[in-house]
Amino acid sequence: MGAVRVPLPVRVLPQIAERAWFTPPRPSARARARDALALEGVEPITLTVDGRPRPGFVTGEGPLMVVAHGWGGRAAQMLDLARSAARRGYRAVAIDSPGHNTDDKSTSDGFQMAAGLEAVVASFGPPAGVIAHSLGAIATVMAFRDRPPDVAVWLAPVLDVRESLEIFSHRAKLAPWTARSLKRRVERFIGDWWPALTAGPDADLPGAEILIVHDPADPDSGFDRSAALADRRAKTRLVEAPETGHNLLLRDPNVIDSVERFLDEARVVTNHPGP
C-alpha cells in the first residue's frame, strides 16, 4: 500500500482489514501489455485449479521445474527464471495462482497458491525442482513438504507470515485493535499450518538443495530470516542481491546467472542428467 491513502474502514474494522489482507494487488494494464509481448512464442497452458481455469506457460524439456510467483504476482513475471531453468535442461511450468492477475475471483491465500502448484504436478508429474518468489516460497513448503523436490530456488522468500502481517498493518495504518484482531483471524484461518508458516529460519523442504537469493535491504521480506536459515541449514546457499528490492531480482542478469550456476552444481549433486 505504501503511500496510498488507506480508507478508514480498512484501518478500524477488522473484517474489512481481513478482506484487504486476502486481496492480492492486480497488475496495471501496462504491465499486462508487457506480459503479453513477453509471452509471444511461449507455449501457453491452462490448468484447472479448484474448478477454475488458470493460465500459464511451459518452456523447455526435461525434469519438471515448478515455477511459483509471489503474492500479487503472475506467471509472466517468472519468465526469465523459467527460461534459465529451461537452458539448464528442465521443463519449467508456471501458472497464475487463483485470485491473481486476470482471475475474476478477487481474493486468494497460501492454500490456493499451493493448490495451483499441486495442479501443475498433477498435470506434469513430480517436480525435480522449484523456483519460487516471495510468498511462493511458503506455497512450495505447503505443497511439497511431504514430497520435496531435489532443488529449490527461493527469491526474496517470505518465511514468516507474522512478519508479513506486521508490514501490512504498518502500511495500512491499522489501529492497534484492528491489527491484533487481524492476526487472530489469520491465525484461525491458517489453523494447523500456523507453525510451518511462521517457521522463519526453520522453514524447510527436507533434503532439498536450496538457493536463497535476497536483497539485504528488501522492504517486503526479512533478509535476516534468509541469512539465519542459510546459517542453520545444511545444503543451503545464500546469495545477496543488493539494490534489487523485492521484485527486480526476478529479471536481474546477475541473479539469473547465480540461479543457472546453482542448477548446474545441484544437478551434479543430485545426479540428474545434464541438458
Stretch-by-stretch model annotation:
Residues 205-207, 212-214, 218:
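Short beta-strand/loop motif that positions the catalytic acidic residue
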Residues 146-190:
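Hydrolase active-site cap/lid region
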Residues 219-225:
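Conserved alpha/beta-hydrolase "acid-adjacent" motif
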Residues 106-128:
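Alpha/beta-hydrolase active-site loop
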Residues 131-140:
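Gly/Ala-rich beta-loop-alpha elbow adjacent to hydrolase catalytic centers
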Residues 75, 82-104:
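Conserved alpha/beta-hydrolase
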Residues 1-48:
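An N-terminal hydrophobic leader/cap segment in hydrolases
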Residues 244-254:
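Catalytic histidine-centered segment of alpha/beta-hydrolase-like enzymes
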